Amino acid sequence: MLTEQQRRELDWEKTDGLMPAIVQHAVSGEVLMLGYMNPQALDKTIESGHVTFFSRTKQRLWTKGETSGHVLNVVSIAPDCDNDTLLVLANPVGPTCHKGTSSCFGDASHQWLFLYQLEQLLAERKTADPTSSYTAKLYASGTKRIAQKVGEEGVETALAATVNDRFELTNEASDLMYHLLVLLQDQDLNLTTVIDNLRKRHQ
């Protein structure tokens, strides 16, 4: 969240008391929507943990999802370099747009969004009927079997590379990635955990 110093340095005068707030998906990086906050909306956002704007139409504070239940759970808030715009990282509950899409900017999705959506699907498969899909059956077979599949797909990926078969390498790498995501979900981990760890190693 914002530090006390960051909050004091926000330039409300420059924005006539209404500061643009860009909301971005905390996991996928997709830009979800743009709204405007006054100091009271920012305070309520921080206190409640749900993104709250000042509605220029309704002339009142408006918490995203207050009617639909599709709230935006705040992960972090950061000002830009001029202290006149906010970047809000949030995890959405349901679609963000009133039209039913994940973003108010249509289908111009971030490529990472597909992996996030795939992870969500895999998480649902964990508790599904084992007869309903290949993935649900794989979860039911247990961690050892899932780990074995990751090993098998890893070997097949490596073999495809050694014979310079780019088509087969792409297919095998896709299978490897899929089964690796299944294994991570099985262990209550996700791709974000891995990415965060890679960032730490890079620093």
UniProtKB/Swiss-Prot annotation:
User: Which is a Pfam family this sequence falls into?
Assistant: PRA-PH
A single MF term (Gene Ontology): phosphoribosyl-AMP cyclohydrolase activity
Pathway assignment: Amino-acid biosynthesis; L-histidine biosynthesis; L-histidine from 5-phospho-alpha-D-ribose 1-diphosphate: step 2/9; Amino-acid biosynthesis; L-histidine biosynthesis; L-histidine from 5-phospho-alpha-D-ribose 1-diphosphate: step 3/9
User: Which reactions appear under catalytic activity for this entry?
Assistant: 1-(5-phospho-beta-D-ribosyl)-ATP + H2O = 1-(5-phospho-beta-D-ribosyl)-5'-AMP + diphosphate + H(+); 1-(5-phospho-beta-D-ribosyl)-5'-AMP + H2O = 1-(5-phospho-beta-D-ribosyl)-5-[(5-phospho-beta-D-ribosylamino)methylideneamino]imidazole-4-carboxamide
Renumbered residue ranges of the record's region Phosphoribosyl-ATP pyrophosphohydrolase: 115-203
Segments of this protein annotated with the region Phosphoribosyl-AMP cyclohydrolase: 1-114
Its subcellular locations are: Cytoplasm
| Taxonomic superkingdom | Bacteria
SUPFAM superfamilies in the record: all-alpha NTP pyrophosphatases, HisI-like
EC number per UniProt: 3.5.4.19, 3.6.1.31
Q: Which GO terms describe its biological process?
A: L-histidine biosynthetic process
**Gene Ontology cellular component annotations, sorted alphabetically:** cytoplasm
User: Main site of residence?
Assistant: cytoplasm
NCBIfam families the record matches? histidine_hisI, PRK00051.1, PRK02759.1
Q: What family is reported?
A: In the N-terminal section; belongs to the PRA-CH family. In the C-terminal section; belongs to the PRA-PH family.
- Alphabetized HAMAP family for the sequence: HisE, HisIE
Q: What is this protein called?
A: Histidine biosynthesis bifunctional protein HisIE
* Native source organism of the sequence: Salmonella typhimurium (strain LT2 / SGSC1412 / ATCC 700720)
